[in-house]
Amino acid sequence: MADGFSLNDALAGSGNPNPQGWPGAWGNQPGAGGYPGASYPGAYPGQAPPGGYPGQAPPSAYPGPTGPSAYPGPTAPGAYPGPTAPGAFPGQPGGPGAYPSAPGAYPSAPGAYPATGPFGAPTGPLTVPYDMPLPGGVMPRMLITIIGTVKPNANSITLNFKKGNDIAFHFNPRFNENNRRVIVCNTKQDNNWGREERQSAFPFESGKPFKIQVLVEADHFKVAVNDVHLLQYNHRMKNLREISQLGIIGDITLTSASHAMI
């Protein structure tokens, strides 16, 4: 299921090759236009343009309010999972527009978390098993973010996107299945499991923090772990609006679980 991937792949079928709120490429690849934060071509942040008054900084230079996509500063609303400011959480919603670019600062915004954990999330933990409501179901451009730490000697992690008793998307990293590490994806309808899809790439480590991000698209889910694209799972249940809950279980300490539209 894992394969080569690009920004155009991530946005396939959206009708917009570069929609607002998606400044970075999927999988933490730098976007077009050079390294984020290049305020003046070739100039060190804060350096005046040719002919400027000594010490005068060009617009959007550092320090001071940054322009769109300038570094440091927050990402655009809902950006996933492109580069962010120091201490900021990749992909968390930022305010529309620029903020003063104090290194490590992250402006408060609805749904945002303070940057206190290893991925900029608050220190939990939340109780596992944990059920997160998805009011109105899931829909294209919805981004679900789960942050936590794998317990030592872990056996498995499970995410279940549920429609009543059915499971639209079962994401199940297994740390020791016949002495192998594998990720199993599946769907359960009318109490019957479908055909398993297995993934050998395994980015989780016992005792280590992780960030899982699930992006809902019109015909599939995309999953990235620690800002790297992992797999794609085609929808087997077509009525996405009926997928109204995410269940999180397994051998983890859960720090946060959130969703946002991008």
From Swiss-Prot:
InterPro entries: ConA-like_dom_sf (IPR013320), Galectin-like (IPR044156), Galectin_CRD (IPR001079). Residues 47-66 have a biased composition (Pro residues). It is found in: Cytoplasm; Nucleus; Secreted. The keyword Calcium does not apply. GO terms for cellular component: cell surface; cornified envelope; cytoplasm; external side of plasma membrane; extracellular matrix; extracellular space; glial cell projection; immunological synapse. Residues 37-46, 67-91 have a biased composition (Low complexity). Pfam families: Gal-bind_lectin. Residues 35-112 are annotated as: 9 X 9 AA tandem repeats of Y-P-G-X(3)-P-[GS]-[AG]. One of its GO terms (biological process) is response to quercetin. A beta-D-galactoside binds at residues 193-199. Keywords: Acetylation, Cytoplasm, Differentiation, Disulfide bond, IgE-binding protein, Immunity, Innate immunity, Lectin, mRNA processing, mRNA splicing, Nucleus, Phosphoprotein, Repeat, Secreted, Spliceosome. Gene3D superfamilies: 2.60.120.200. The modification N-acetylalanine is found at residue 2. The modification Phosphoserine is found at residues 6, 200. Residues 130-260 form the Galectin domain. PANTHER family: GALECTIN, GALECTIN-3. Galactose-specific lectin which binds IgE. May mediate with the alpha-3, beta-1 integrin the stimulation by CSPG4 of endothelial cells migration. In the nucleus: acts as a pre-mRNA splicing factor. Involved in acute inflammatory responses including neutrophil activation and adhesion, chemoattraction of monocytes macrophages, opsonization of apoptotic neutrophils, and activation of mast cells. Together with TRIM16, coordinates the recognition of membrane damage with mobilization of the core autophagy regulators ATG16L1 and BECN1 in response to damaged endomembranes. Probably forms homo- or heterodimers. Interacts with DMBT1. Interacts with CD6 and ALCAM. Forms a complex with the ITGA3, ITGB1 and CSPG4. Interacts with LGALS3BP, LYPD3, ZFTRAF1 and UACA. Interacts with TRIM16; this interaction mediates autophagy of damage endomembranes. Interacts with and inhibits by binding NCR3/NKp30. This is Galectin-3. It comes from Rattus norvegicus (Rat).
